[in-house]
């Protein structure tokens, strides 16, 4: 199953991917900035069906500050590295600078332990597979996570409901984003759910038919 939370003033979607058989889970984009948001996330993980889940991975779709507002406290709480693509590591070091502009009270996170992932790598959360697909264009290091057993893809800020991520920030590139979305995301089956970094969910078939950026 996939549990969604929406955190901080940028309304970022944080996802918890749960393997219900093994009670293992992965946290994707821990955006919980406020202490009450931390508590919501920790309470879900630690009281799931009256038992505690084992967090095995803390994943980032990308390292823009709104998506990592809770990264340090989550990594420290579960004593795990952050799992991400190498091309986005510099954004951890720039978190404080970006945060001061965007209203986030975060420090630089370049000291956090990083477990690097590559395009097409398969992660296992218990018996649940997560396929890592590198989809740059919104920013360096941007990943989409495909979950075949859930018929879903977590797209971060690459793909939204009938829209796409902005490409005017450092490292963004519009042609690259369009090409990667068409070749790496829209090739998934039409019935796959699209779980974006902001806003409501969609479906691959609907994005292929109605997303004007991708027609």
Residue ranges and their predicted role:
Residues 5, 17, 119-125:
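Short acidic-hydrophobic surface loop/beta-edge motif
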């Amino acid at each position: 199953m996939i549990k969604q939370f929406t955190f901080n003033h940028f309304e970022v979607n944080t996802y918890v991917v749960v393997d219900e058989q093994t009670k293992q889970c992965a946290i994707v984009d821990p955006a919980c900035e406020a202490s009450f948001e931390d508590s919501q996330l920790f309470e879900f993980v630690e009281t799931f069906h009256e038992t505690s889940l084992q967090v095995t991975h803390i994943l980032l779709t990308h390292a823009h500050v709104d998506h990592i507002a809770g990264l340090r406290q989550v990594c420290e709480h579960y004593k795990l590295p952050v799992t991400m693509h190498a091309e986005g590591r510099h954004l951890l070091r720039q978190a404080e600078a970006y945060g001061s502009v965007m209203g986030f009270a975060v420090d630089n996170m370049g000291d956090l332990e990083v477990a690097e992932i590559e395009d097409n790598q398969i992660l296992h959360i218990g018996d649940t597979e997560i396929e890592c697909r590198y989809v740059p264009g919104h920013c360096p290091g941007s990943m989409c996570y495909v979950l075949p057993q859930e018929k879903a893809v977590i797209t971060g800020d690459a793909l939204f409901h009938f829209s796409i991520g902005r490409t005017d920030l450092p490292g963004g590139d519009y042609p690259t984003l369009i090409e990667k979305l068409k070749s790496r995301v829209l090739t998934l089956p039409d019935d796959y759910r699209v779980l974006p970094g902001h806003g409501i969910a969609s479906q691959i078939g609907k994005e292929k038919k109605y997303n004007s950026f991708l027609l």
